[in-house]
């Protein structure tokens, strides 16, 4: 159950001590005499009787009968909160009537203050505390300051984010340019590798063809050598009457040094001397036989070969040496 309360209401330079009752229906009723005294009425009872409509007035005992607060059961006579049963209470409308009929120059401002600040706070908190209003103002200022600080920080953060975003975009563009350049370089390298591989394949094909031709030429030359040896052997099989002195027997000696074939003809003593003089190994001698006319046999054996020859030698390669012609 609510009790009779007293509050110190400060308006500008003036301070009002008003007693009031907050009823169950959340209606505030002020002690009419307190309001009249604060408004500087000379005869408060007359002012209340004349200026306040009856519908805005009630007695404290009526409030008690309607189930309102019972001040006398709590406080004693003489206490500021003690109210006589015939104490007149007025609603906010009655307070407004007293304010408007007063001769105060700030009556309108006082009315606005009462309606917009005092009564709403009493209804909300059960009392009026000017500090609450001040704290509200301070809170508003703090909130405003916090909002301004937050806005400033947000703007700064947005600027940093925008700058970082711009830097990232530039870095991304730089990376994309580098990647594009590298892709072109790789593409150029791939093209070069393809060209090199094509050239190598062409060279390898040409090499294979050259080696095949070489093999064919070597086979042809081997056939020529075989034919030459066969002719020399065939000539060696002919029956001829030779001198009794074996040192004077005519001899045909054919030696081979790689692709160079050299014939030594003459009496056996001469042939042996030439072999010794030229340091001819036995392994290099293709044929060495007694022939009736070694020079004629050599000429006949090499007559059909398609090669240039010296007097006693034939070389199957493409370079020329003293008394030798090399055919490839």
From Swiss-Prot:
Domain Bro-N: 3-126
Xref: InterPro entries: BRO_N_domain (IPR003497)
Domain of life, per lineage: Viruses
SMART domains, alphabetized: Bro-N
Swiss-Prot/TrEMBL keywords: Early protein
Note: Probably expressed early and still present late in infection.
Entry protein name: Uncharacterized Bro-N domain-containing protein ORF2
Lineage, uppermost ranks: Viruses, Viruses incertae sedis, Naldaviricetes, Lefavirales, Baculoviridae
